[in-house]
């Protein structure tokens, strides 16, 4: 049987994007209907302004360990932040930078190439601190900076809010191109996240970009509907040129968006429509003040 820590960790790592907003703003309204789910989510992703330990009352309601369980969940928070490409604000700065396995240093430190900064991250509170100057040491530094410039233009053109990064990986034989865009709309009961990770080999005779595009959306008004997609991507580029590489990536993301749109239309007109209950057409007005006394099989159908 799984331990309390293992169960709590699995909830944390599987939490939908932005659900801390639901947990705090909608907690009273949904407390009875979704109490276990909301409580777990409330401790898994936190608003920028309040530490996760402020949700200790929720933890106490779910586990006998109460807030004492938080330290044992640190690995789960770290995995979540790196996998979901969580963004943090650098101290004294307005821009957000992302956290991933590709820009990780020793301990809980990460680096951002564009701002030339390394920083420490508290994975529980999702806050950055101890920022220091950082100089990228890579034989592909010029390519990385060129990719960042083109990626910045792509992000500005196609995403309302977006964080991105380009990092040397695999002993400097390849670079990782990483992008994340979040849209949170708790007042309309939905939150979403777009993630894209691409690997570009730089010391290969054939230049093929491989990667994945992931879209996660959660809709929770009077229900609980989630969209989780994972699209493998393989792109051939004629040369290791930053402009052409980002152009191919932009085309792949646009094509996938159109593919998702077609899938939504097909699902709405097919599967979802088939789920609706088909009621008989009687061409008779319904007397709503008497609806509580109707015998559905007879009165509505006009029978006696």
Write out the residue ranges for each language-model feature.
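C-terminal/domain-edge helix-coil "capping" segments
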Residues: 52, 61, 75, 79, ...
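Sequence-level detector for tyrosine residue identity
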Residues: 30, 80, 102, 110, ...
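Long amphipathic alpha-helical scaffold segments
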Residues: 65-66, 70-159, 195
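Alpha-helical protein-protein interaction scaffolds
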Residues: 1-108
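Extended, non-membrane alpha-helical segments enriched in charged/polar residues
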Residues: 13, 32, 36-39, 75, ...
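Polar/charged alpha-helical tracts
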Residues: 9, 23, 31-32, 142-149, ...
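A generic structural signal for ordered alpha-helices
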Residues: 125, 129, 195-196, 242, ...
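Surface-exposed short loop/turn segments
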Residues: 145, 149, 153, 157, ...
């Amino acid at each position: 049987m799984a331990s309390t820590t293992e169960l709590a960790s699995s909830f944390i790592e599987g939490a939908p994007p932005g659900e801390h907003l639901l947990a705090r703003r909608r907690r009273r309204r949904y407390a009875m209907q979704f109490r276990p789910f909301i409580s777990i989510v409330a401790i898994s992703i936190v608003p920028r302004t309040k530490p996760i330990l402020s949700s200790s009352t929720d933890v106490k309601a779910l586990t006998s360990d109460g807030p004492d369980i938080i330290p044992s969940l640190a690995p789960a928070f770290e995995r979540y932040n790196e996998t979901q490409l969580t963004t943090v604000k650098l101290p004294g700065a307005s821009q957000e930078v992302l956290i991933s396995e590709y820009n990780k240093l020793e301990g809980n430190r990460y680096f951002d190439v564009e701002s030339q900064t390394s920083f420490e991250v508290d994975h529980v509170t999702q806050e950055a601190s101890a920022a220091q100057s950082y100089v990228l040491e890579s034989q592909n530094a010029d390519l990385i900076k060129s990719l960042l410039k083109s990626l910045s233009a792509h992000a500005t053109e196609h995403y309302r809010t977006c964080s991105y990064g380009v990092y040397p990986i695999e002993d400097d034989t390849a670079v990782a191109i990483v992008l994340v865009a979040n849209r949170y709309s708790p007042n309309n009961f939905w939150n979403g996240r777009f993630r894209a990770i691409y690997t570009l080999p730089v010391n290969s005779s054939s230049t093929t970009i491989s990667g994945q595009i992931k879209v996660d959306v959660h809709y929770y008004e009077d229900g609980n509907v989630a969209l989780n997609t994972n699209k493998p991507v393989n792109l051939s580029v004629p040369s290791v040129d930053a402009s052409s590489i980002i152009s191919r990536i932009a085309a792949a993301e646009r094509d996938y968006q159109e593919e998702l749109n077609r899938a939504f239309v097909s699902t709405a007109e097919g599967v979802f429509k088939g789920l609706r209950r088909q009621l008989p057409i009687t061409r008779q007005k319904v007397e709503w003040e008497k609806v509580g006394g109707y015998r559905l099989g007879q009165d509505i159908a006009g029978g006696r």
